[in-house]
Swiss-Prot record:
InterPro entries linked: Ribosomal_eS4, Ribosomal_eS4_central_region, Ribosomal_eS4_central_sf, Ribosomal_eS4_N, S4_RNA-bd, S4_RNA-bd_sf
GO biological processes: translation
Gene Ontology MF term list: RNA binding; rRNA binding; structural constituent of ribosome
Gene3D superfamilies: 2.40.50.740, RNA-binding S4 domain (3.10.290.10)
Protein name: Small ribosomal subunit protein eS4
Native species: Korarchaeum cryptofilum (strain OPF8)
Similarity field: Belongs to the eukaryotic ribosomal protein eS4 family.
Sequence ranges assigned to domain S4 RNA-binding in this UniProt record: 43-114
Keywords in alphabetical order: Ribonucleoprotein, Ribosomal protein, RNA-binding, rRNA-binding
SMART domains reported in the protein's UniProt record: S4
Domain of life where this protein originates: Archaea
GO cellular component: cytosolic small ribosomal subunit
């Protein structure tokens, strides 16, 4: 979880480089609220509404749209214009019938892709923590700050869960294993989807779209998105 103290404002020159703003035109930029995504892993909702989706031309217009609870993130209305939207989050605007997923990009770090209505209530989350709690139950923590209590599932950190939104009921468990499809989340290959060919300190992958292309990465920068093919639209 990202927490920031000090000023309630953020100078545009100090903002993450991937923010969709013209830094020379704006002195200040909205400072994200503490939430499930760190400051360098998400984009405030106001910037998404105004600068990415072009639903408003000014910050005031964007705040008004958000305050009217017209924007859903992961199936829930969000009225805090500073709310951070990050990797794999789903944005829905029921009034105009459009849905988007936040995916990695090699140049902009994060970008939105439009997704079908049938996928608007599904999300992939990466398991980043696992511990046993009272009663012997297993608690899992995901990359977006969610907690899951599961019995009888051999889920490991690095695996992914396909969940239903907003209930976060688990639909499927995707293991990080040889043959799994993984999405690269950082680096020059960010946004590419590869099939795992070798697992060690470095993960060996072969691109799904271009089998002649192979690349390597670390597990921390990968998220399992399917067994043989991605279970959701990611490109």
């Amino acid at each position: 979880m990202g927490k920031m103290g000090g000023s309630r404002h953020l100078k545009s020159l100090a903002a993450p480089g991937y923010y969709p703003i013209a830094k020379r035109e704006r002195v200040w930029v909205v400072k994200p609220s503490p939430g499930p995504h760190a400051i360098d892993e998400g984009i405030p909702l106001l910037l998404i509404v105004r600068d990415m989706l072009k639903l408003a031309t000014t910050a005031r217009e964007a705040r008004r749209i958000i305050s009217m609870k017209k924007i859903l993130v992961d199936g829930k209305p969000r009225y805090d214009y500073k709310f951070q939207v990050g990797l794999m989050d789903v944005i829905s605007i029921p009034e105009i019938g459009v849905n988007y997923r936040m995916v990695p990009d090699p140049h902009r770090f994060l970008r939105l892709i439009e997704i079908p209505q049938s996928e608007s209530k599904m999300k992939l989350v990466k398991v980043i923590g696992k511990r046993t709690i009272r009663g012997g139950r297993i608690q899992l923590t995901s990359h977006d700050g969610r907690n899951f209590l599961l019995d009888g599932r051999d889920v490991k950190p690095g695996d992914s869960l396909l969940i239903e939104l907003p209930s976060q009921s688990v639909i499927d468990h995707l293991r990080f294993d040889t043959g799994s499809s993984v999405l690269v989340t950082r680096g020059r290959m960010a946004g590419r989807i590869g099939r795992v060919e070798g697992i060690g300190t470095i993960i060996e992958m072969r691109d799904l779209e271009n089998p002649e292309l192979s690349y390597r990465g670390v597990k921390e920068n990968l998220i399992v998105v399917g067994k043989e093919r991605p279970v959701l639209k990611l490109r």
